[in-house]
């Protein structure tokens, strides 16, 4: 019987994945913020960029990395080693590529920890959506886990929705 997808397993796995990727790619520390209740139905928290990567197998679901514009530009600058005033960090294609790589690596690390816990699964391709007032809604039948991280004064939200396979 496959292990259960507990809140502790999910929070620990995403925290390790985010911390490892940010330390390696951005050379920055991240700090998980205290656990908060998932947003209520109809909640109005919005973002300008959503990066999602799904996974299928003994665990099925999707991880959304949710960023405001300031965080997406910060990630792009740090990953590419750009100066704070370099306009390249605001180029939509450059931001998409940088954040997409961070999302793929982060969810890959998360998936590896699920595999290590006895829940083998594989990743889907990353998807990046950019716009105004973007929201993540709960998928039908999925358990939702929302974990916020702080990095250099910026906030990253990992919105994880999953089901046991």
What would you call each of these model-derived segments?
Residues 1-165:
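N-terminal auxiliary interaction/assembly segments of multi-subunit proteins
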């Amino acid at each position: 019987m496959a292990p259960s997808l507990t809140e502790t397993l999910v929070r620990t796995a995403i925290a390790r994945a985010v911390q490892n990727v940010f330390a390696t790619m951005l050379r920055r520390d991240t700090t998980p913020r205290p656990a908060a209740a998932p947003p209520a139905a109809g909640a109005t928290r919005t973002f300008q960029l959503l990066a999602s990567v799904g996974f299928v197998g003994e665990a099925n679901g999707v991880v959304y990395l949710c960023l405001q514009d300031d965080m997406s530009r910060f990630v792009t600058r740090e990953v590419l080693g750009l100066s704070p005033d370099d306009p390249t960090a605001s180029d939509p294609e450059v931001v998409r590529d940088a954040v997409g790589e961070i999302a793929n690596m982060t969810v890959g690390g998360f998936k590896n920890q699920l595999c290590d816990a006895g829940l083998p699964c594989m990743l889907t391709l990353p998807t990046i959506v950019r716009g105004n007032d973007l929201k993540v809604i709960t998928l039908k039948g999925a358990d939702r886990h929302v974990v916020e991280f702080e990095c250099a004064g910026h906030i990253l939200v990992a919105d994880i929705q999953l089901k046991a396979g």
